Amino acid sequence: MTERPEQIQSRLAGLDQIGQVTSALNAIASGQSAAARGALPAISAHAATVADALAVAAALAGAGPGGGEGPGLLLIVGAAQGFSGAYPARLAEAARAALTPGTAVLAVGGRTLAALADKGVAVLWSAEQAPLPEAVPDLASRITDAILDLVGTHPGPIRALTGAADPGGAPEIATIFPPEVAPARGALPDLTLPPAELLQGLLSEALFAAVARTLMQGLAAEAQARMQAMANARNNLRERRAKMQAAWQQARQEQMTTEMIELASARPDAAAQD
């Protein structure tokens, strides 16, 4: 049964409303992506400063960052919200493939946490992703504290997995601890702290910087995934609207034809009555 033009017009209005929602979500995601990417250089600069200080502290202490033997920890920074397409599932699959027996998992992002559960990945510690770049330092501090609490019972390297820095790229995994310590440059300074104590504090700060960078990159990657999902949704809406517009025109033409036939068939009766 062909729908009436009024019914199709109502459905067209509904599609237009959905289009407005997707446009708003895309605008928000675009702003988040730009803000997160804009914050990355500052985090990298902080990490570089810590690395320079770490080189000096290691030289004075006569020791490196160390790190126990074992499977270690895996930090997964994923998606907090929906409307991000297959991004949470891709991260969960990459995490499952990267796991080794005994690895403890820390996960950030509710959507990715659910995807990890679907893949059968057990999570030891979890948190929601920062909603804005401004909230990343506080979350990075919490995660750093959680990692430091767990390294005693889960020795080994600490790796981080999140979305690619480049849009559309595969998830990226990297070892964030222990850091690589470069040789110290220039004369070594005098210290007021014991070198070993300074080294330990700088190692914690290096871990914090690496976690913050991973969180910020994950925030940008999630926003980029949402932008791609909204672009796909807009393309789908355009196709559906074009088909529905054609259906409306056909229904309207059929309605007009029916009205003309009814008018034409009514004239002889009117003439006979005269």
Predicted regions and their residues:
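N-terminal assembly/interaction segments in proteins that build large macromolecular machines
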Residues: 1-274
